[in-house]
């Protein structure tokens, strides 16, 4: 059955990775209380009860209603359990076909409803969907355990695993993944331990869902409202218009509403000239979910960390990080810490150097006052203007969203991979802002569908990510249907969407995840697309980021939205020259967050954390990354990646993957850059492979050698 991937990174991104069995299994014991109704009528009206009639089995959003989800979960899980029971009860000896492959075929209805539901709860949630999610989440956990802790089923998987050397390579890989997943899910535990594991998993599913809801609520509630436009001095016209629109959407009587993004440092701070407004925005962002209100998450995260540690101990691991990393490229917490701390010294030194530079500038502007955290990015933007004669306000008019997509991202896809993107306005979407493209290969054949959902709204969680509605699998005969999601401020009606260059690189980043899913050539759902280790999944995304800086790309997509003039060569040169400006700040906030993640998840089951924020401060001090002016990219109470988005003990993965991306991109540049030959090799040896082949073996095949981290240091301006 197809895997349900979830993802987000330093750019708040990424595909969520779950095994296909976990996805399909994750819902079975849901017994919803619904009105008595003729089941035949109910099935005929519920669009999930049959495969979609649309091309590529795309979701029938014009038919889907909130009330369809619970019945579809109920029937989907019942059907799936019956399929699994049939597999476990087969009288004949276990074979790959009657056990592993049969499990991959199972759970079609459950997959359909899960894919749509969990995409909607992140992109356009509402009170009804949140109530369904709260009800479904613990039942999904129980369902997963029902399957993965079944001794008869595991005995058959073990039998296939024992004979795996006789299987073809891809089937052997799949048998190994199933066996590993079941063992890591507790299949070998005794009765009492299994019961405790079930309880932990159910409680964790509830608490992580609660965290997500509290974070969304407090992020919306913490938005900063100002009455006077003078308080927004420095903000461009598009930003002011968006703030006015946000206030209207929130039902406020006039004024301007500055909504918050997911990280600690808000992008808008670099533009706001009024220091008091900067302070309000910064404090609103960094105090989220720790204000002592109903959305305070401190007790919740402490409980989540404790439960994860207990589960790891049950499964034979010292800590949750040991458990997670045993199935990743890094392997161990010590390997992660070694990688992060080996760079920390150079990063801290660069941040100190930047601080000296910014203080000198700031003291000229504010004599007798001290630089504060809310001043950093504003001062950095002013220094960048001075040093490189580069003003973000000068750059933004050249980056209109549609042109960046059509003539930037899609141009790269065409040059590298030979594909073209065709608008499909005939297909329904879940929101008016969503667009659909059919991806056509060089020979005119269809690759799949690509959905885009780029505008922010209160019902969408923060950040940027890729997900899928349908996964590629030759076993089931399905082509990929993927979606890229961001949180770009929507302009006033009739106004163009102008994006920052950071948003441009995020667009390319998420598109890298998109093509990873689109170009998958796997037979089995579990091994396809982005179903790879966390510290590998960010490799294609960060590899594609670098094409945003390619002069040939910028020459096409950086066109002034009013004059139609291409961006001047002199301005392009400034963008390239300033690329690594501020890397001390960016690298330190990231490494601090990654080490904070490791601090929480290397606690053993006996550890007791009292004050959450005191623990955070001590962890950063111990790691020598505590900086008075640079908070971690995410503080503990709003660190969604590790508490609700599948990156627990995994936030390091962005830098681990970045090392692969930097090395691969450098090699591509040495071999001619954005050429069809380079693209064909990357598509064939990386993007199409999923988890069919060990990730590091994929990388070595593409590079022709082992990883060299020199390119990473250069990419971050640390060497």
Question: What function would you assign to each model-found segment?
Answer:
Residues 1-17:
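N-terminal secretory signal peptides that target proteins for export/translocation
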Residues 22-32:
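Bacterial N-terminal signal peptides
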Residues 38-236, 241, 668:
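N-terminal helix-rich structural modules
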Residues 41-65, 75, 234, 255-257, ...:
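C-terminal, non-catalytic "cap/extension" segments appended to globular domains
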Residues 53-68, 116-136, 157-199, 259-299, ...:
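Short His/Asp/Glu-rich catalytic/ion-coordination signatures at enzyme active sites or charged loops
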Residues 86-91, 95, 320, 423-426, ...:
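Surface-exposed patches in mature extracellular/periplasmic domains of secreted proteins
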Residues 174, 206, 213, 218-259, ...:
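Active-site-proximal, well-structured secondary-structure segments within enzyme catalytic domains
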Residues 489-508:
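Short pre-active-site segment immediately N-terminal to the catalytic Zn-binding motif
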């Amino acid at each position: 059955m197809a895997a349900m991937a979830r993802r987000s990174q330093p750019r708040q991104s990424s595909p969520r990775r779950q095994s296909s069995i976990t996805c399909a299994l994750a819902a079975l014991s849901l017994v919803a209380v619904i009105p008595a109704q003729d089941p035949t009528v109910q099935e005929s009206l519920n669009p999930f009860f049959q495969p979609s009639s649309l091309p590529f089995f795309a979701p029938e959003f014009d038919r889907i209603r909130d009330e369809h989800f619970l019945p579809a979960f109920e029937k989907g899980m019942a059907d799936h359990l019956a399929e699994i029971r049939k597999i476990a009860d087969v009288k004949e000896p276990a074979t790959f076909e009657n056990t592993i492959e049969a499990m991959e075929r199972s759970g079609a209805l459950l997959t359909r409803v899960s894919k749509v539901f969990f995409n909607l709860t992140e992109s356009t949630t509402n009170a009804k969907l949140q109530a369904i999610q709260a009800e479904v989440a613990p039942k999904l956990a129980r369902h997963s355990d029902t399957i993965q802790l079944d001794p008869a089923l595991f005995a058959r998987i073990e039998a296939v695993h024992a004979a795996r050397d006789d299987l073809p390579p891809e089937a052997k890989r799949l048998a190994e993944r199933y066996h590993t997943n079941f063992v890591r899910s507790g299949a070998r535990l005794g009765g009492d331990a299994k019961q405790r594991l079930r309880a932990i998993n159910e409680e964790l599913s509830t608490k992580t869902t609660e965290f997500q809801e509290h974070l969304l609520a407090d992020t919306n509630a913490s938005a900063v409202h100002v009455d006077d436009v003078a308080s927004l001095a420095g903000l461009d016209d598009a930003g002011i218009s968006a703030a006015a629109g946000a206030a209207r959407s929130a039902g406020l009587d006039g004024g301007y509403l500055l909504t918050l993004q997911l990280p600690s440092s808000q992008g808008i701070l670099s533009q706001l000239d009024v220091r008091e407004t900067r302070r309000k925005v910064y404090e609103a962002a960094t105090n989220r979910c720790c204000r002592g209100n109903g959305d305070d998450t401190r007790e919740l995260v402490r409980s989540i960390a404790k439960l994860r540690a207990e589960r790891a101990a049950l499964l034979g691991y010292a800590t949750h990080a040991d458990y997670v990393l045993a199935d990743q490229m890094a392997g161990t917490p010590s390997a992660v810490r070694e990688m992060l701390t080996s760079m920390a010294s150079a990063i801290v030194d660069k941040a100190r150097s930047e601080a000296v530079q910014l203080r000198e500038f700031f003291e000229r502007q504010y004599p007798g006052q001290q630089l504060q955290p809310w001043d950093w990015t504003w001062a950095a933007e002013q220094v960048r203007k001075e040093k490189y004669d580069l003003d973000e306000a000068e750059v933004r008019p050249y980056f209109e969203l549609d042109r960046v997509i059509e003539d930037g991202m899609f141009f790269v896809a065409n040059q590298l991979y030979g594909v073209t993107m065709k608008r499909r306005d005939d297909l329904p979407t879940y929101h008016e802002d969503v667009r659909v493209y059919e991806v056509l290969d060089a020979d005119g054949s269809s690759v799949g569908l690509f959905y885009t959902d780029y505008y922010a709204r209160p019902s969408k969680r923060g950040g940027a990510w890729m997900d899928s509605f349908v996964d590629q699998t030759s076993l089931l005969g399905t082509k990929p249907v993927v979606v890229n999601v961001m949180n770009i401020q929507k302009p006033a009606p009739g106004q163009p969407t102008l994006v920052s260059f950071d948003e441009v690189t995020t667009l390319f980043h998420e598109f890298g995840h998109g093509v990873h899913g689109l170009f998958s050539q796997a037979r089995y759902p579990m091994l396809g697309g982005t179903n790879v280790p966390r510290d590998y999944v960010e490799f294609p995304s960060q590899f594609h980021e670098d094409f945003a800086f390619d002069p040939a790309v910028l020459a096409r997509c950086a066109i002034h939205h009013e004059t139609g003039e291409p961006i001047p060569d002199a301005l392009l040169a400034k963008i390239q020259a300033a690329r690594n400006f501020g890397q001390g700040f960016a690298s330190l906030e990231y490494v601090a967050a990654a080490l904070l993640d490791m601090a929480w998840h290397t606690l053993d089951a006996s550890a007791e954390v009292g004050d959450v924020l005191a623990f955070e401060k001590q962890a950063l001090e111990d790691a020598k990354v505590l900086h008075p002016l640079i908070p971690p990219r995410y503080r503990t109470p709003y660190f969604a990646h590790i508490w609700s988005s599948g990156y627990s003990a995994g936030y390091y993965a962005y830098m681990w993957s970045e090392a692969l991306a930097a090395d691969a991109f450098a090699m591509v540049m040495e071999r001619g850059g954005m050429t069809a030959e380079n693209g064909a090799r990357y598509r064939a040896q990386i993007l199409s492979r999923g988890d069919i082949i060990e990730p590091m073996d994929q990388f070595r095949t593409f590079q022709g050698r082992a990883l060299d981290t020199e390119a990473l240091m250069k990419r971050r301006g640390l060497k």
